[in-house]
Amino acid sequence: MYAQTCCSGGIPLSNNIGMSVEEKGTFQLSLNYDYNNLNTLNNGTEKLNDDSRLRITNSILFNISYAVTNRLSVEGLFTWVNQRRVISQFGNENLDQTSGIGDGLLLLKYNFKNGLGKNSNIELGLGAKIPFGSSTETNNQGITLNADLQPGSNAWDVVYFLSASKQANFRPSLTFSGRIIYRSTGTNNSYFENSSYKFGNEIQTFLGVSDQFSILKTLATPSISLKYRDAKQDEIDGFNLDNTGGNWLFIIPDFSINIKPNLVFSTRAELPLYSNVDGTQLTPTYRITTGFLFKIKPKSKLLNLR
């Protein structure tokens, strides 16, 4: 949402939606592991010389998509998450962590083929983030942890999706793409039982280029993209919460390879180029995502010749 937290450490929902719209009847299944390391403390754009705080999020992400028609598809994302926060001071280490089912997402997408000319696609989508995860986990002392460490949010969000891609005329395997995801967040009205909490609205934009090459009798697809993320400040009881929100720019190198015609292995890194946070916050140091994509295409219809 990739991340619904003051320090960008949450489940990467928004980063992991937008599977391609395939021919009618095609199922797509994707299983990924996501590791997000935050060990950089910023005050605004200034990096502070303080590595005493560490935040790690481990996520298991399961996507499923079905092509209802050649243009319309429905996609779901289900998650499991482990969040860890470590503070080391004066030789002592304080660890808070939670694990469990995270929030999910349901997205309906429509593909306008050749919307930007020959060999192009435009996809529009509308969806919802569904609050499956717990938002009341406690530490070892029985104290309820803050919202940014909870597996879930106890709030429904509305998700707007727009993507576009176009193949180069001079090299059809070369593809330029862009994607915009806007998340309008809902409110948890039972935060600490009698308060309300709202994560900041968020927009993410991606610009990328990919190409395909034949390697060892199979296809490999390297790509590079830029991601810009802007998150507004969180709110508690209707008031802006300091040290939340900001904007970031990342570079994302990605490599995927076809193990079989219907099975793809991929891995990518997300590295920060620019971070500008509100107040003082932990900000991403690096993120690694790796996993598999499996496609089940409909059986070809047999022609009955009489």
Q: What residues fall within each predicted segment?
A:
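Residue-level signature of outer-membrane beta-barrel architecture
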Residues: 33, 66, 78, 110-112, ...
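Residues that define the transmembrane beta-barrel architecture of outer-membrane proteins
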Residues: 25, 56-60, 98-106, 120, ...
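Outer-membrane pore/translocation modules
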Residues: 83-86, 91-198
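Outer membrane beta-barrel transmembrane domains
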Residues: 40-42, 48-50, 188-306
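Outer-membrane beta-barrel channels and translocator barrels
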Residues: 24, 36, 69-71, 81, ...
